[in-house]
Regions:
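Subset of outer-membrane beta-barrel
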Residues: 1-260
Length: 260
């Protein structure tokens, strides 16, 4: 769960539930997610399914693997215009709600990783769907478009002492007609059970991360971030909580410690 710009009227709120599971051959894996976003009067729902094929590239300490993934998803955008506080209460543009159609999309990515490093590239939505109002039979107008976005990420874990590791990572995001954005993450892993760190998204936000590996199966996390833009001081920051649970079935081993 993520609450952004707490105290700001109409601030974004996001809930996500996801899962992933390797198959018996260990070469194939699948997963899925359900996500809900609310920003002002707009709600969006997304359902996705993922499949991945993994290649073993090494059997040494790193146990390097290369994973190729495909994603299929459907999204729907709804706008509750009647909830908007307007000056002219009789404005016909705000007297109806808009229910968009379900929009299909596909994505792809690749992920190279070992026990202590990773490098990934992805494009979760390759189709540039138009967001069109279909609540009126008299006309349709384009509200926006799902632009194609590319992500690149990389990270590495260095052991400093027996119970202390340093884990930096970077993320770069590129979207058509939008400035290139990215962030840097500096994390420390203590006793393999606790991860604390900070991050900075260029000209956007700065934040702090804390995670606790309660057991081999359960991990809890909390993130606090503050804007470094003109929004600073207008809200109580953004807060995110995370719960991750690994289900062991039969003799399947749980990798521990697992950095990412």
């Amino acid at each position: 769960h993520r609450s952004q710009w707490v105290g700001f009227d109409g601030a974004p709120v996001t809930q996500t539930l996801s899962f992933n599971k390797p198959l018996k051959t260990d070469e194939f894996a699948f997963g899925g997610a359900i996500a809900h976003d609310k920003i002002g009067p707009t709600n969006s729902f997304n359902i996705s399914m993922d499949g991945a094929y993994r290649l073993n590239l090494g059997h040494g300490r790193e146990r390097t693997k290369l994973s190729f993934g495909l994603k299929g998803s459907i999204s729907r955008y709804q706008t509750n215009l009647t909830s908007v506080d307007v000056v002219d209460k009789g404005d016909e543009s705000f007297l109806r709600n808009e229910n968009g159609s379900w929009l299909p999309n596909v994505g792809a990515g690749a992920f190279l990783y070992g026990r202590t490093y990773f490098l990934g590239v992805s494009a979760p939505k390759l189709l540039t769907n138009k967001l069109v109002n279909r609540s009126s039979s008299l006309f349709e107008y384009m509200q926006g478009r799902e632009e194609r976005t590319y992500y690149m990420t990389a990270g590495k874990v260095w052991k400093i002492r027996r119970q202390l590791s340093f884990y930096p990572a970077v993320l770069v995001k590129a979207t058509k007609n939008a400035p290139l954005s990215g962030g840097a993450f500096l994390n420390f892993i203590v006793m393999t059970e606790f991860k604390i760190g900070a991050y900075y998204n260029f000209k956007e936000v700065a934040g702090a991360i804390a995670q606790w590996q309660v057991s081999k199966k359960l991990r809890l996390g909390y993130t606090l971030e503050m804007p470094v833009t003109s929004l600073f001081g207008t809200n109580l920051g953004s807060h995110e909580i995370m719960l991750n649970y690994s289900i062991k079935k039969g003799r399947t081993a749980i990798i521990y410690p697992k950095y990412f």
